[in-house]
Design a protein with these regions (language model features):
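Fungal secretory targeting signals
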Residues: 1-16
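Short, surface-exposed patches at the edges or C-terminal ends of soluble domains, predominantly
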Residues: 16-459
Length: 459
């Protein structure tokens, strides 16, 4: 009995300490163990947020992402290796399998050394493209740190990013300047809806290898906002993969550094706060949606009895109500989900195609969830229909709910009477006019017999 109680207490403590909604086991892969001390503030912050950190070299024989067919870790943080590959346990196939098993990954790159072919192949699988020159970095002659990169201009100074669009939530915004040394440039494929830029390069930036001569404009592959500094991939299973172009931005040095832009003032960096936002989103501390109760029923004036909720069969032209409860995870607690101002959470009432597509409106809320509702009339079409909520937005986990119901015709005793249908009044009037005319004719016939003629007798 005591050991059961002890296990229960341990489980509760672990649940309280683990801020991530998907687990606390974090594997950090770094090639050189001497570099571990350069990121001590990052490790301390992650441990303070409840993560259980494990450090492994990509060359380690004990390294494995899976145990008995299941994930051995919940999250993966890969620092750029100095060798050509990541070892037999971290091939592109193994990493993609980890992603398909709902694992979350942060991949950090660096312009200090050329990117390995294994990482390039992995990113190509995700439609993220690196520069053809593996040693290229992002240069900007207008947004650089004059204190540390007065000549090379390879330490970018950027503002924290705003929301991607007005209908997308902002998870990485805020005040302050980010210092991003020696960024490895990356571009995103245009066909995938699963990719989203977190932080783009300024319009004055371009990518080139500083070891070579200054290129002509025709030799530059990508410039400006085509270049991404930080990119995000959210798979269809809502697993997350973040590509950070500058691993040096996570070092203790840049967490507490002061920088100065051209013609600007000396200001402290906000790299530490941005690192928390970035790892928090990737490891599912933010942007996680959860669906609670889903209810649908016939519209009534009063409260709905439990046995009347979620019926399997509706009738055509029924007034119907649909409710869905949605929560959002924010670091350590569930809160009511609020749809961005220019976005809509929608319900589709669909058979082969939607017969109704309706915006769901917030109707009530609790401390942990918000209830969205709508009311509509079932279509004049019988068949198998579905209540479907399909909400997929950048930086938010997917909501895909589908509940099937049957819609039937009127029963023989449910059709409206003919006198209740205004379109039938003319036919009813014609019927009664014929009956009335016939009765009038009968009366006239019966009471209008011809008189007999009185003829005189003649001999």
């Amino acid at each position: 009995m005591r050991w059961c109680l002890a296990l229960l207490i341990c489980a509760l403590v672990a649940a309280v300490n683990a801020l991530s909604s998907s687990g606390s086991r974090l594997l950090v892969v770094l090639d050189d163990t001497t570099e571990k001390s350069s990121y001590s503030t990052l490790w301390s912050d992650l441990e303070g947020r409840g993560y259980d950190l494990s450090f492994e070299s990509p060359k380690s024989d004990q390294l494995s992402l899976f145990a008995h067919g299941e994930r051995a870790y919940d999250h993966l943080l890969i620092l750029p290796p100095k060798s050509k590959g990541l070892g037999p346990a971290l091939t592109p196939k193994h990493i993609l399998d980890f992603l398909n098993k709902d694992g979350n990954i942060v991949l950090a790159l660096s312009g200090k050394s050329s990117t390995s072919s294994a990482i390039s192949s992995l990113l190509l699988e995700l439609d993220v493209h690196l520069s053809n020159d593996r040693s290229a970095v992002v240069i900007d002659h207008f947004n650089y740190d004059t204190l540390s990169a007065a000549e090379k201009h390879d330490v970018l100074l950027l503002q924290r990013p705003n929301a991607l669009r007005t209908d997308v939530k902002a998870f990485f915004d805020g005040e302050g300047v980010l210092a991003l040394p020696r960024v490895a440039p990356q571009t995103l494929g245009s066909d995938s809806q699963l990719l989203a830029p977190i932080l783009k390069a300024p319009t004055t930036a371009y990518a080139y290898n500083p070891k070579e001569e200054m290129p002509s404009p025709d030799d530059i592959e990508s410039t400006g906002s085509q270049l991404n500094v930080v990119s995000a991939i959210q798979a269809r299973n809502s697993a997350r993969f973040t590509v950070l172009g500058s691993v040096e931005a996570l070092e203790d040095k840049w967490f507490s550094a002061s920088v100065k832009a051209p013609n600007g003032k000396k200001v402290p960096t906000v790299n530490r706060e941005f690192a928390k936002q970035l790892t928090g989103w990737t490891f599912k501390e933010t942007g996680v949606l959860k669906v609670g109760k889903i209810e649908h029923h016939l519209a009534t004036d009063g409260e709905v009895a439990a046995e009347d909720l979620n019926p399997k069969i509706y009738r055509i032209k029924n007034e119907t109500v649909f409710n869905i409860e949605v929560s959002e995870y924010v670091y350590d607690k569930w809160v009511p989900f609020e749809v961005p101002g220019d976005d809509k959470l929608q319900l589709e009432f669909t058979m082969l195609s939607p017969f109704h597509r309706l915006a769901l409106q917030p109707t009530s809320r609790t401390e942990t969830s918000a209830v969205y509702s709508t009311q509509f009339v079932t279509p004049d079409q019988h068949g198998i229909f579905s209540f479907r909520v399909n909400y997929k937005r950048p930086f938010l986990t997917n909501i895909e709910e589908k509940h099937e119901v049957t819609v039937r015709h009127f029963a023989h005793d449910e059709y409206p009477r003919s006198w209740a249908i205004s379109g039938g009044w003319v036919w009813i009037a014609g019927l009664w006019s014929v009956i009335g005319g016939f009765l009038a004719f009968v009366v006239v016939w019966l009471y209008s017999a011809p008189t007999a003629d009185k003829a005189k007798k003649t001999q």
